[in-house]
Amino acid sequence: MVNEEYRGLVYPWGRQSPIANGEPLEVAPGVWWVRFGMPGGLDHINIWLLEDSDGWTVVDTCLKLDSAKAQWEQLFTGFMANKPIARVICTHLHPDHIGLAGWLCERFDCELWMTRSEYLNGSLLLSYTSDVVPSTALQFYKRAGFTDELMTTYQQRFGTFGKMSEPLPHSYRRIVDLETRPCNM
């Protein structure tokens, strides 16, 4: 495997990556990289599986898609069949990262781990299910300099966040600044 550099970043795996919707690739002992395919310009998400003594730690989850749930089902009955999911960590609130967190936590009766701001903001955005944009939001973006074209796009997309994610669990385990968590324990 050859290290590759791009704009000062070093990619130790070079151009190697897991196949979309394929088998996990081990990048360190007990650390597995899985790629889930998604529709759109960003056509995939990288998901990490950390093998711990009490089960799997899942880092990020994919959008709420039937194809993603099917890929998870394949992992549950194949690669991950020896241990349950013990915890789900979401790195941030984007739907491709939190989309199936609630589904996984409910299925495996495990905790969601997130920072407070990401959990609370994600929960707030998931609550916007109406197609009607609040006037305060329109005023905010207009004052922020949105053009008429951007305002139209914002109005058309408003409320779609919740369609891309399952509801988050009602409780979570807060990740705090500088916290570390050893894996493979």
Predicted segments — roles?
Residues 1-15:
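N-terminal presequences and immediately downstream first alpha-helices
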Residues 7-8, 58, 85-87:
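A short, structure-level motif marking secondary-structure boundaries and short turns
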Residues 11, 35, 89-90:
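A generic structural signal for short
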Residues 13, 17-24:
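Short acidic, Pro/Gly- and aromatic-enriched capping/linker segments at domain boundaries
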Residues 24-83:
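Conserved beta-strand hairpin/beta-sheet module of binuclear metal-dependent hydrolase folds
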Residues 46-50, 179-185:
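Short acidic loop-to-beta-strand element that houses the catalytic metal-binding Asp/Glu
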Residues 67, 73-181:
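Active-site HxH/HxHxD metal-binding segment of metal-dependent hydrolases
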